[in-house]
């Protein structure tokens, strides 16, 4: 039995559902984002790029954030309406996450992906997690149609030469990535 660390009752304050899907069918590829207010606009651009290249596919978007203002409400509602899709906003309490280690490059929002994993456990057969700075330039049908074996995670492994990794580790001040890492912004 899988243990869930982030209980909904502790982290989830409210859900806003912009459901403008034409079909009532619930089957869709769930695509999730975890972002703070600094990347909400970029998140919208990422969603729009996916929708632009994947018309006709059943997609549902889930944004986990600790801030969602009036302008954001109008923008994401209009986006869902324009593309006849569903965008759900999960307002989370990030207070406990703010106590975890962060840097100037990685805010407490990097931990939202763990909340997302626990939230969808036993709720969705497959979830595509993307960082808000991901832009889609084509179809994602191979991801939509891909069938995973049970309890499988797929991720993008960033490639590079050893000296490139050493420079990245130095520039980010994180010695542990000198031997490489996987890109946690796409899994």
Regions found by a protein language model. Give the residues of each.
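Glycosyltransferase catalytic domains, chiefly GT-A lineage
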Residues: 1-187
